[in-house]
Amino acid sequence: MPSLPPQRAAVLAFLQEQAQAGVSPSLAEIAQAFGFASRNAAQKHVQALADAGLIELLPNQKRGIRLPGGAGRDALLALPVLGRVAAGLPIGADIGLERQLWLDRALFSLRPDYLLQVQGDSMIDDGILDGDLVGVHRSNEARDGQIVVARVDGEITIKRLERGAERIRLLPRNRAHAPIVVAADADFAIEGLYCGLIRQG
């Protein structure tokens, strides 16, 4: 499934909730629900979702939005956005609930427990960009080579994990950034595994 901007993902979640209730909303109702100035903004999101294969549009019908396979609220996850994570130098652990998003389970490889907003460009070669919201599956264990959210001396970062015989390194995916070598006496912990993203804007 393609990455979705948060607002488009929210429109999809709204359509799924309405489908669960047996309702196919009109463009005017979608525009009203999201505070859009006109039906055209709703049409843009609906058409993009249809082009991505996430919904079906029945021609010449005011209420012609259908979900493939009848997906409903069971396909949704309520995910809290818990602050920022550095894709660059580690940033302070300012974890705290910012908001909550309803998102499709199929957006993620693992079931995420929360979302973090990426700050920085050190993971761009893995397709993780500044401003993206990344899904994090809580785990204190990870395999060599996995993308992890890690805590180093009270600060958090997202990097690829490299377990060496004598040391751990957190590897960026941008040649402009240097690896983070975890000192033997560092306060280090794996907070979770990266399991997908949605793109802002």
From Swiss-Prot:
Quaternary structure annotation from Swiss-Prot or TrEMBL: Homodimer.
Gene Ontology cellular component annotations, sorted alphabetically: protein-DNA complex
Swiss-Prot/TrEMBL keywords: Autocatalytic cleavage, DNA damage, DNA repair, DNA replication, DNA-binding, Hydrolase, Repressor, SOS response, Transcription, Transcription regulation
Sites marked Cleavage: 87-88
Similarity comment text for this entry: Belongs to the peptidase S24 family.
Protein name in UniProt: LexA repressor 1
Pfam family, one: LexA_DNA_bind
Catalytic activity, EC: 3.4.21.88
Record GO terms (molecular function): DNA-binding transcription repressor activity; serine-type endopeptidase activity; transcription cis-regulatory region binding
PANTHER family for this protein: LEXA REPRESSOR, LEXA REPRESSOR-RELATED
Keyword Magnesium annotated: no
Portion annotated as DNA-binding: 27-47
Domain of life: Bacteria
Catalytic activity: Hydrolysis of Ala-|-Gly bond in repressor LexA
Residues of the active site: 122, 159
Enzyme class: hydrolase
Organism of origin: Xanthomonas axonopodis pv. citri (strain 306)
InterPro entries reported for this sequence: LexA, LexA-like, LexA/Signal_pep-like_sf, LexA_DNA-bd_dom, LexA_repressor, Peptidase_S24_LexA, Peptidase_S24_S26A/B/C, WH-like_DNA-bd_sf
Keyword Transcription regulation in record: yes
Described purpose of this protein according to its UniProt entry: Represses a number of genes involved in the response to DNA damage (SOS response), including recA and lexA. In the presence of single-stranded DNA, RecA interacts with LexA causing an autocatalytic cleavage which disrupts the DNA-binding part of LexA, leading to derepression of the SOS regulon and eventually DNA repair.
GO process terms (BP): DNA repair; DNA replication; negative regulation of DNA-templated transcription; proteolysis; SOS response
